[in-house]
Amino acid sequence: LECHNQQSSEPPTTTRCSGGETNCYKKRWRDHRGYRTERGCGCPTVKKGIELNCCTTDRCNN
């Protein structure tokens, strides 16, 4: 599986997920600088108030 791993509004980059990982994620939240976005492999548990999208196809988390 290949997932995007750039932060917020950086140019798109991808990473090849290891260990048979089947999910990509995109996490979004707001702080004093505005909206922040984090992308990567897996489907992490998030705290209340954080928007999380998990998906299972190559580069689905941009």
Swiss-Prot record:
Gene3D superfamilies: CD59. Binds to muscle nicotinic acetylcholine receptor (nAChR) and inhibit acetylcholine from binding to the receptor, thereby impairing neuromuscular transmission. Residues 1-20 are annotated as: Disordered. It is found in: Secreted. Belongs to the three-finger toxin family. Short-chain subfamily. Type I alpha-neurotoxin sub-subfamily. GO terms for cellular component: extracellular region. It comes from Naja mossambica. Keywords: Acetylcholine receptor inhibiting toxin, Disulfide bond, Ion channel impairing toxin, Neurotoxin, Postsynaptic neurotoxin, Secreted, Toxin. The keyword Secreted applies. Expressed by the venom gland. Disulfide bonds join C3-C24, C17-C41, C43-C54, C55-C60. It comes from the Eukaryota. The keyword Secreted applies. Its main location: secreted. This is Short neurotoxin 1. GO terms for molecular function: acetylcholine receptor inhibitor activity; ion channel regulator activity; toxin activity. It holds the Pfam family Toxin_cobra-type.
